[in-house]
Amino acid sequence: EQAAVSPALNAGIPAVPQILTKNAEHFIHTARALHEAGYDEINLNLGCPSGTVTAKGKGSGMLRDPGVLAAFLDEIFAAAPCAISVKTRIGYDSVEEWPALLALLSRYPISELTVHPRTRRELYGGSPHKEAFAQALKCAPFPCVYNGDLRTKADCAALTRDYPGTAALMIGRGLV
């Protein structure tokens, strides 16, 4: 498994390994191993909406209980050997969860926040709640990256035009 994440495989390409877990000890152990292998940043996945992932309380399943999420973040940020970035959805059930979630995330020294502006319940349906991303740009103390429904160059140009201050764009399913 370690050979698969060797930095030598990504020579010349800025790569950030992503960890999908709900166990802080596992995150810290894996982050240390990745840091020792040469990575300076690790990404925490709070965005995966897959039913098989969220049923185990991982990915966007962690957004269901802010208290559990806060305890997890307290532990990993206290022991992090390197920078931690986060990819997240804007809530589990409802867009109304976003202000409190953003406030919670803003308590931590996140190196970069990637926002997919849908809830877990929405999966990939409907339109992204871009106003939630705008709120992150306005309120977050760290750089914010947009993710969701970017399929063309025109989509990317429109997003960066409409939301100045966007640190970067993340293209997921739109690339496929």
Residue ranges and their predicted role:
Residues 1-176:
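Flavin-dependent oxidoreductase catalytic cores
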